[in-house]
From Swiss-Prot:
It is found in: Cell inner membrane. It holds the Pfam family ATP-synt_ab_N. Gene3D superfamilies: 2.40.30.20, ATP synthase alpha/beta chain, C-terminal domain, P-loop containing nucleotide triphosphate hydrolases. It comes from Psychromonas ingrahamii (strain DSM 17664 / CCUG 51855 / 37). Keywords: ATP synthesis, ATP-binding, Cell inner membrane, Cell membrane, CF(1), Hydrogen ion transport, Ion transport, Membrane, Nucleotide-binding, Translocase, Transport. PANTHER family: ATP SYNTHASE SUBUNIT ALPHA, MITOCHONDRIAL. This is ATP synthase subunit alpha 2.
C-alpha cells in the first residue's frame, strides 16, 4: 500500500485540531516528619487554616499550624503507614459533614459515617463543621421553654429554646442522666436531639443508645461518637460536627437540642494536639485559645428570627423561627468550679446546673444545688403554671438549708421554725425523681401546687413521693380532660387554681396512699 504524504499531513492536522490539553494545577507537599498523629509538611505554599490535606494512604489530615517553612497537620485516622518523603495534596476544602433528617435514629462518627451497622445514610447535603455564629440582628429573644422533665430543673433552673445551659459537677453525680432524660422528654415535643459523646468508653455510649431506643427517643436523635479509643483530633472535632448537624434544623425553622458530653474531654484532646504541635502552653498547660475553642462552639446555639430562616431557605420557609439549645457538660475535680475550663464555660453559657457529690450521696437525686444553680434567660421562657407555682420552692429550700444548719446548734426551736424545717424537708423530698421517668407539665404543676398550698402538711416525709404518685394517677384517670388541657397550654388562672384545689381536696378526702 502506497502512503500519500498529503493525506498523512491532513490526518495529523485533524488530530492536532481535536486534541485538548488538560492541565491540572495541584498544590503538593512532602511529609518531613510523622509522630503521634501529627504530620509536618513542606511545600504546601497556599494552604488554608483548617484545610483538608489528602494523604497517600487515602486518609486526610487537617492543617492547624501554618508556619514559615512548613504546615503542621493533625491526621484524622490511622497514621502508622505514613512515611517521611511521601507526597500529599491540598484539597482546597475544609472539613464537611453530612446533614439532614436522614441522620435521625443513627449513630455516626465525627465525620458523619454510620457506625451502627444499619447501612448507608441518605443525607440532604453537607455542611462545614466551622460556621460563623448568627449575628445579633439575626437572633430572637428566648421565650419558649425546653421541658427537661426534671421537676427540680423546670421549676428552679428553667431552660429556654436557644439557650446554653451548663451541667457541671464531679464524676458520677448524674450529669449524663439529666441530659439523657431531657432528650427522652422531647419525643413528643417536636424537638430534634443530637447527643455528642466525647472521650467516653464505648460500653457507656452503647448503654446510652440502648436506653434512648428503649424509651422511643432514638428515632428523633442523632448520636455522634468520638469514643476514648478515637484519636485526639476526632474527639476535638466531634462537638463542631454535631453542632453543624443541629444547625441544619435551626436554619430551616425547626427546634433542636444538642448535648455535649463532655467538653472537659474535648479541651484535654485539644491540649494534647496543641502540645504536639509545639504551641506555647498557658495555665494548666492549655493553649492560649482554649476559651475560643468553646466560645465559638457555644455561640452557635441560638434562637434565630423568622427573617433569618426565610433568607436562609430562600423563601421556602416563612414565619417560623428556629433554635438550637445547647446543654454542655463539664466535669470538675473535687468540686472545684474555679478551675480554668469550668470558669471559661460558666462565663460563656447562660447559666449552670451545679450537681454536688454531697447531695448525691445523701440520696437527693437529681443532686441539683439550688443555691448556686442559675438560669439567666430561662425565666422568661418558663410556662405560666410552672412559673407561678415554682416561686416559693427555691425560697423554701434556701430557708430550709439555712435553718437546718442553725438547728444543729439550737436545742429549743419555736413553732414557726419547726414548721419551716418540716416544709423544707418535704419540698426536698418532693424534688427527688427517678431516672428515665420525665414528668409532664401537668404532673409537675400538681406536685408543685400540693407543696406550695400546704397540702403536704399532714403527710409524713417518707410518704411524700407516694402521695405525689397517687395524686398524679388520680388526676390522670378522674380529671383526664383538665390534665390534657394543662399539658397543652401550660396556662394558670383563677379557674385553674380552683380546679387544682378541687382535685387535691377530693383526692385527700377519698384516696389513701
Amino acid at each position: 500500500m502506497q502512503l500519500n504524504s498529503t493525506e498523512i499531513s491532513d490526518l495529523i492536522k485533524q488530530r492536532i485540531g481535536k486534541f485538548e490539553a488538560v492541565s491540572e494545577a495541584r498544590n503538593e507537599g512532602t511529609i518531613v516528619s510523622v509522630s503521634d498523629g501529627i504530620v509536618r509538611i513542606n511545600g504546601l505554599a497556599e494552604c488554608m487554616q483548617g484545610e483538608m490535606i489528602e494523604l497517600p494512604n487515602g486518609g486526610f489530615a487537617m492543617a492547624l499550624n501554618l508556619e514559615r517553612d512548613s504546615v503542621g497537620a493533625v491526621v484524622m485516622g490511622p497514621f502508622r503507614d505514613l512515611r517521611e518523603g511521601q507526597k500529599v495534596k491540598s484539597t482546597g476544602r475544609i472539613l464537611e459533614v453530612p446533614v439532614g433528617k436522614g441522620l435521625l435514629g443513627r449513630v455516626v462518627n465525627t465525620l458523619g459515617a454510620p457506625i451502627d451497622g444499619k447501612g448507608p445514610i441518605e443525607n440532604d447535603g453537607y455542611s462545614p463543621i466551622e460556621v460563623i455564629a448568627p449575628g445579633v440582628i439575626d437572633r430572637k429573644s428566648v421565650d419558649q421553654p425546653v421541658q427537661t422533665g426534671w421537676k427540680s430543673i423546670d421549676s428552679m433552673v428553667p431552660i429556654g429554646r436557644g439557650q446554653r445551659e451548663l451541667i457541671i459537677g464531679d464524676r458520677q453525680v448524674g450529669k449524663t442522666a439529666i441530659a439523657i432524660d431531657a432528650i427522652i422528654n422531647q419525643k413528643h415535643t417536636g424537638l430534634f436531639s443530637i447527643y455528642v459523646a466525647i472521650g467516653q468508653k464505648a460500653s457507656t455510649i452503647a448503654n446510652v443508645v440502648n436506653k434512648l431506643e428503649e424509651h422511643g427517643a432514638l428515632e428523633n436523635t442523632i448520636v455522634v461518637v468520638a469514643s476514648a479509643s478515637e484519636t485526639a483530633a476526632l474527639q476535638y472535632l466531634a462537638p463542631y460536627a454535631g453542632c453543624s448537624m443541629g444547625e441544619y434544623f435551626r436554619d430551616r425553622g425547626e427546634d433542636a437540642l444538642i448535648v455535649y458530653d463532655d467538653l472537659s474531654k474535648q479541651a484535654v484532646a485539644y491540649r494534647q494536639i496543641s502540645l504536639l504541635l509545639k504551641r506555647p502552653p498557658g495555665r494548666e498547660a492549655y493553649p492560649g485559645d482554649v476559651f475560643y475553642l468553646h466560645s465559638r462552639l457555644l455561640e452557635r446555639a441560638s434562637r434565630v428570627s423568622a427573617a433569618y430562616v426565610e433568607a436562609f431557605t430562600k423563601g421556602a420557609v416563612k414565619g417560623k423561627t428556629g433554635s438550637l439549645t445547647a446543654l454542655p457538660i463539664i466535669e470538675t475535680q473535687g468540686g472545684d468550679v474555679s478551675a480554668f475550663v469550668p470558669t471559661n464555660v460558666i462565663s460563656i453559657t447562660d447559666g449552670q446546673i451545679f450537681l454536688t457529690t454531697e447531695l448525691f450521696n445523701s440520696g437527693i437525686r437529681p443532686a441539683v444545688d439550688p443555691g448556686i444553680s442559675v438560669s439567666r434567660v430561662g425565666g422568661s421562657a418558663q410556662c405560666k403554671v410552672i412559673k407561678k407555682l415554682a416561686g416559693g420552692i427555691r425560697t423554701a429550700l434556701a430557708q430550709y438549708r439555712e435553718l437546718a444548719a442553725f438547728a444543729q446548734f439550737a436545742s429549743d426551736l419555736d413553732e414557726t421554725t419547726r414548721k419551716q424545717l418540716d416544709h423544707g424537708k418535704k419540698v426536698t423530698e418532693l424534688m427527688k425523681q427517678k431516672q428515665y421517668a420525665p414528668m409532664s407539665v401537668a404532673e409537675q404543676a400538681l406536685s408543685l401546687f400540693s407543696a406550695e398550698k400546704g397540702y403536704l402538711t399532714d403527710v409524713d416525709v417518707e410518704k411524700v413521693l407516694d402521695f405525689e404518685s397517687s395524686l398524679i394517677s388520680y388526676a390522670k384517670t378522674e380529671h383526664a380532660e383538665f390534665y390534657a388541657q394543662l399539658n397543652e397550654t401550660g396556662d394558670y388562672s383563677k379557674e385553674i387554681e380552683g380546679q387544682f384545689h378541687a382535685i387535691l381536696e377530693t383526692f385527700k378526702a377519698t384516696q389513701t396512699w
